[in-house]
């Protein structure tokens, strides 16, 4: 029964000091670029992302997000939604992957539109970010660390940690959900949008009676904890060990007031938290 993705879900939130509402509906191909822009903007002040872009081969967050949507929007094991305000503007989006669940129980809906000609998939069909990481052999990942720059070592460290964690939390035979992304436009953060998206996913997990896990940024973990997620593993990173240069006045000024704690001399430490939520009324 495909229940959640076929109906509009309404949430009350606080907008500009007064009560307002958002509607959560399935993502369409026409929404991809806007959602990718929201992702890129949201991560533009994340010091972990900034440091990783200082390598010899910096990545473009807009392109990474856009390509991820293109690869997974038509997959029946991935559900993507958008949060829309009363003016029709997208204020956030979220996605969930499903493991070990019968496809007829996954609340997936084919997009109402078709991908434009310029949105040809450039990522092999059937591979999301999490799944492609899970398919990488750990020994191969270790070999790739030879003769790499510090940023490349950081990427390799995180990739290996992700593979190890995924093998631990969802070995063959596991039934679960995992959050592939949950982003709120910066100007709408701390107004209930993120909580509404988390609750939407939680309701799906509760109906299916499965656990959900997430690889959380240093900024988002408190929000997940508020909605029932608990930390089961952490990866602590000394960003100054990997950064090829100090933040300097430029980045210190740009990140002032963001809560990132960057100084002119130090990027600081950053903690990636793996978090898990059990469904309500589970028997464990």
Residue ranges, per PLM feature:
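Conserved acyl-CoA
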Residues: 168-174, 196-212
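Conserved GNAT-fold acetyl-CoA-binding loop/helix
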Residues: 46-67, 108, 113-123, 128
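Conserved active-site alpha-helix within GNAT-family acetyltransferase domains
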Residues: 195, 207-209, 218-238
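A short beta-loop-alpha structural element at the N-terminal edge
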Residues: 23-37
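Conserved acyl-donor/pantetheine-binding loop and adjacent beta-alpha core of acyl/acetyltransferases
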Residues: 90, 95-183, 189, 236-274, ...
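Conserved acetyl-CoA-binding loop-helix of GNAT-fold acetyltransferases
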Residues: 184, 190-203, 226
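Active-site rim helix/loop that mediates acceptor-substrate recognition in acyltransferases
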Residues: 53-80, 85, 167-168
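Helix-loop element at the rim of GNAT/NAT acetyltransferase active sites that forms part
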Residues: 37-56, 71-72, 103
């Amino acid at each position: 029964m495909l229940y959640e993705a076929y109906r509009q879900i309404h949430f009350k939130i606080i907008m500009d000091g007064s009560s307002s509402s958002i509607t959560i509906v399935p993502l369409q191909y026409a929404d991809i670029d806007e959602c990718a822009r929201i992702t890129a903007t949201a991560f533009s002040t994340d010091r972990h992302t900034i440091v990783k872009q200082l390598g010899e081969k910096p990545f473009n967050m807009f392109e990474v997000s856009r390509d991820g949507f293109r690869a997974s929007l038509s997959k029946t094991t991935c559900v993507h939604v958008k949060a829309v305000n009363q003016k029709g503007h997208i204020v956030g989006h979220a996605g969930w992957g499903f493991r070990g669940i019968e496809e007829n129980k996954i609340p997936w809906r084919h997009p109402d539109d078709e991908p434009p000609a310029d949105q040809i998939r450039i990522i092999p069909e059937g591979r999301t970010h999490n799944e492609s990481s899970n398919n990488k052999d750990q020994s191969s990942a270790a070999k790739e660390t030879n003769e790499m720059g510090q940023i490349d070592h950081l990427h390799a460290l995180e990739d290996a940690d992700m593979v190890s964690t995924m093998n631990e939390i969802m070995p063959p035979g596991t039934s679960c959900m995992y959050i592939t992304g949950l982003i709120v436009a910066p100007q709408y953060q701390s107004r209930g949008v993120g909580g509404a998206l988390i609750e939407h996913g939680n309701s799906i997990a509760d109906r299916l009676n499965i656990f959900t896990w997430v690889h959380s940024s240093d900024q988002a973990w408190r929000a997940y904890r508020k909605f029932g997620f608990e930390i089961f593993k952490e990866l602590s990173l000394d960003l100054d060990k990997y950064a090829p240069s100090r933040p300097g006045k430029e980045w210190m000024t740009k990140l002032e007031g963001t809560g990132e704690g960057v100084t002119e001399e130090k990027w600081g430490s950053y903690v990636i938290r793996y978090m898990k939520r059990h469904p309500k009324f589970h028997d464990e």
